[in-house]
């Protein structure tokens, strides 16, 4: 039987460690992927993902069922990433960003070239624009949800997405 996030959170609040295990297994890959795409360092992404789930447990009593669980959890992840950037005050290295690709053997050379170009273009974006693109196109959040979870005005998110798309288009035109 598949439990909803709401049912699992209710179980966690009642001390059910099995519910916690299911919820972490369900959300760990998406949270790790989001963080890794933002900070581009495997060990830091692993550590921050662990921090997100620790913070989730510490704050689970403050989660209200009328909130979307994924928005609440991604807000925690966003805040952990912003704390990381503030503490480290470093830029994201473009050479370390990795995107999952299927087995490259059947891929045509042209497809590989395009994928690498998109990865490189995305890595050149400023962090706020890259984050908006990742949340919207990789994790399928709406513009309104992105604004809420990043605590950013809706017009700013729209602007970031628009600017990022134009910039990505420019970078990709230069490559081809």
List each model region and its residues.
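N-terminal module of bacterial RNA polymerase sigma factors
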Residues: 1-30, 118, 123, 144-145, ...
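Conserved RNAP core-binding helix
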Residues: 8, 24, 32, 42-59
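Structural recognition of an alpha-helix C-terminal capping motif at a helix-to-coil junction
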Residues: 33, 47-54, 67-79
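Short, Lys/Arg-enriched C-terminal cap helix and immediately downstream tail that follows
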Residues: 35, 125, 130, 162-176
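Arg/Lys-rich amphipathic alpha helix in sigma70-family domain 2
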Residues: 61-65, 75-94, 163
